């Protein structure tokens, strides 16, 4: 397993859990796992539409807004390797970030989201991604990332990180204490959220 050699510190998710592609969720009742083709398209479309909106200077929210337009906003494409790593982590039903998810090609960033409902349905991909988009309301474009409150804006900044080119996500839906929970993990390459770099180049 070459993934065991990739990470200088921490254990790679595929090194640690890569032998099984089945959920390992303890007492949680797993209803479904994986990302359908429709969901895959929804994830990529939703990301690219939002990236374009920000790049064109049409995002009015912020602390303060609006967000400045961008000149280097790559269009994201789906990457199956990133998705496999994301799915393997999602399958652990352990909300938070894994230790290492890099590939031989590049370091990899990550967004995670979780939402529960008491009804019989699960929140959609778009609902979870919108939670990341909405963090823009707390982002101050006049300060660098280091001087923003990273815990409040880090999902937004990875979503619109100009140099990121590829995305791959994993998802698991489970029931716990009658709560219908949807857990989404998206991996991004090359990674964003470097404290000493701009989120994107400005026009």
Curated annotation (Swiss-Prot):
This is Venom allergen 5. It is found in: Secreted. PANTHER family: CYSTEINE-RICH SECRETORY PROTEIN-RELATED. Belongs to the CRISP family. Venom allergen 5-like subfamily. The keyword Mitochondrion does not apply. The lineage of its organism: Eukaryota, Metazoa, Ecdysozoa, Arthropoda, Hexapoda. Keywords: Allergen, Disulfide bond, Secreted. Disulfide bonds join 4-15, 7-100, 25-93, 169-186. Residues 45-188 form the SCP domain. The keyword Lipid metabolism does not apply. InterPro entries: Allrgn_V5/Tpx1_CS, CAP_dom, CAP_sf, CRISP-related, V5_allergen-like. It comes from Dolichovespula arenaria. Expressed by the venom gland. Gene3D superfamilies: CAP. GO terms for cellular component: extracellular region.
